């Protein structure tokens, strides 16, 4: 009978000094293990090993290329400034209204959930989602509309986001992101009448398509919450079909749309679906794409129209919205006339005084724009606050 202190004969102890103290972990094996995991993703998923950068770099030891891009997006000052840029309300005073920063975090979260459900590349979705709005102006789309009218050649925040990550960040070096991420950032925007158009996304990666639809869905979810919280609209004002289909609570709306997109886009997994598809596709006409069911898509499209008519457009047309537009216009004209006030490095990178003025104003937060406007034209910024505490 073996005593409680006996050691089984098959267990052997080695003196510590017989174990090599010079053995070092192979950190590159971490990246290889992560890349190997990507091989189990959908055959339609983007793989980090296939990514390219404008300037080739040695691989990181513990991260895939898309994970590196995600990390690069969150460190620049342009990302940090998003916390003080408007989503809808102009310079909101309440603590809980959505900012541009919380918006991109929600887009990344919704996108990752969809990508996980479809066995696509979550890291790529997250990198695009976090970086897609880096180029937004102060006061949201109000500021964007002003610069689009005043700048030769127009202005769009998605193009400016690409300009930031490829040129303006890091004193002209840019972030050197992969083409997958840059393409997703460039093509995330959705014209008001083309929310669920297949033709608009057929040349995008599935991960970029996920961010595109997640951006719109996150908009609706948190903007409805903000509109209700501020009493700008009442729950009973919302289209009845939308409330019945999506639910009354924020969490219900988010869960409903994520589940519907995953179910409707199941062919993106490459798995056998309920109709018997074997996951193989011939030609562009049968290429899988990210979508909603026709029924819920119609409801969401109608809800989006409602939000434009009852929330977004009225905000832009409000006294505060008009003042915000006037501030952006004033600052652009001011710095275009006096380019010597713009940081020298930015002027050098921008290529022209007009472009430098747009780049400078676009980089401002709401509060900084208000402060600068007060210096240029005292009193102009008075009353430019929306949202209830």
Predicted regions mapped to residue ranges:
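Histidine-centered, transition-metal-coordinating active-site segments
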Residues: 3-104, 108-114, 121-122, 154-389
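Post-HEXXH active-site segment of zinc metalloproteases
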Residues: 123, 127, 138-155, 228-233
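Short alpha-helix carrying the canonical HExxH Zn2+-binding catalytic motif
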Residues: 126-131, 213-214
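Alpha-helical ligand/cofactor-binding cores
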Residues: 130, 144, 162
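Short active-site segment of divalent metal-dependent hydrolases/proteases
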Residues: 135-139, 218
